[in-house]
Amino acid sequence: MSYKFGKLAINKSELCLANVLQAGQSFRWIWDEKLNQYSTTMKIGQQEKYSVVILRQDEENEILEFVAVGDCGNQDALKTHLMKYFRLDVSLKHLFDNVWIPSDKAFAKLSPQGIRILAQEPWETLISFICSSNNNISRITRMCNSLCSNFGNLITTIDGVAYHSFPTSEELTSRATEAKLRELGFGYRAKYIIETARKLVNDKAEANITSDTTYLQSICKDAQYEDVREHLMSYNGVGPKVADCVCLMGLHMDGIVPVDVHVSRIAKRDYQISANKNHLKELRTKYNALPISRKKINLELDHIRLMLFKKWGSYAGWAQGVLFSKEIGGTSGSTTTGTIKKRKWDMIKETEAIVTKQMKLKVELSDLHIKEAKID
């Protein structure tokens, strides 16, 4: 099928689709290996209807090409939407040269690789990162696509690939059940997804708001970060890391650093960050008035978040994104063939698990031979 693509001039160092679309932020972009292009469904601008958006990058001529399949208005509307989605108002070169390198020598060894934080739908971000709990990118990708294909609405089919909308909270509560989600492989996350969807439906009704995204954006109005995080953690299955991912990638709080096992490792290994008793006491006092935070927050990890913000400044979340990608390697996510390629870190851990299993087997066989020798 032939489409007329719009064009946007952008240097690969400022935006590299391969380093952004399937690297642990968004989980529904599909890579077409034959056509060298990405596709997904998204709402364009203020529209409530989903359109299929196709992107490809002409790296040699530094051009981003784009087209929408469906009723999204015009090409200018899509271009404006993509500039907001990719946060192209923020210059990575400026952040490297004027913010990060002067304050962190580690960035002097790096250069902009087009890794930036996306401006995503907060509702989809919330559910996606509930799926991320104790999970890897490949499985999160499968889960997010499963939610759409089973409980979203079919938008269209292109070259045999079916494209669906991301289900709203109402659609999840009316179409999904915990049992069905468990059957689809969501495990204990099934309960969290259903209960979060139900709570959001009730929260919207109380606030007289119909849109999931509009409601989640409304909790930021005149609110401090700690209060927004407290509210997000009131949803079942949402801890500090998931809440911080929603704040950073869904609510555009650029200074927030979600601290997971990878970021914690970077902080301790490369920056020697650790919390002493006084640090923990101060944080404990700080959260006295926030009962959910007091219960859910790991104070040592929260100290890491604060120290990294102090080091990297108002775009600390972006700096974390750069080092996170460097740490784990890329991923190729969903493809039009139906396969989901794995990132470097997943392959390393799987190899380690195989080696450990082989070593354990050798030990068991060795023990068995010793026992047999004793019997003889």
Curated annotation (Swiss-Prot):
SMART domains: ENDO3c
Reactions catalysed: 2'-deoxyribonucleotide-(2'-deoxyribose 5'-phosphate)-2'-deoxyribonucleotide-DNA = a 3'-end 2'-deoxyribonucleotide-(2,3-dehydro-2,3-deoxyribose 5'-phosphate)-DNA + a 5'-end 5'-phospho-2'-deoxyribonucleoside-DNA + H(+)
InterPro entries linked to this entry: DNA_glycosylase, HhH-GPD_domain, HhH_base_excis_C, Ogg1, OGG_N, Oxidative_DNA_repair_enzyme
Annotated positions binding 8-oxoguanine: 258, 260, 320, 324
Binding positions (DNA): 134, 139, 189, 262
Organism domain of life: Eukaryota
Principal subcellular localization: nucleus
GO biological process, any: base-excision repair, AP site formation
Subcellular location: Nucleus
EC number(s) stated in the UniProt entry for this protein: 3.2.2.-, 4.2.99.18
Keyword match Cell cycle: no
Active site (record annotation): 241 (schiff-base intermediate with dna)
Keywords: DNA damage, DNA repair, Glycosidase, Hydrolase, Lyase, Multifunctional enzyme, Nucleus
GO cellular component: mitochondrion; nucleus
Gene Ontology molecular function, alphabetical: 8-oxo-7,8-dihydroguanine DNA N-glycosylase activity; class I DNA-(apurinic or apyrimidinic site) endonuclease activity; damaged DNA binding; oxidized purine nucleobase lesion DNA N-glycosylase activity
Miscellaneous notes: Present with 3690 molecules/cell in log phase SD medium.
Function: DNA repair enzyme that incises DNA at 8-oxoG residues. Excises 7,8-dihydro-8-oxoguanine and 2,6-diamino-4-hydroxy-5-N-methylformamidopyrimidine (FAPY) from damaged DNA. Has a beta-lyase activity that nicks DNA 3' to the lesion.
Similarity field: Belongs to the type-1 OGG1 family.
Name assigned to this protein: N-glycosylase/DNA lyase
Organism, scientific name: Saccharomyces cerevisiae (strain ATCC 204508 / S288c)
Gene that encodes it: OGG1
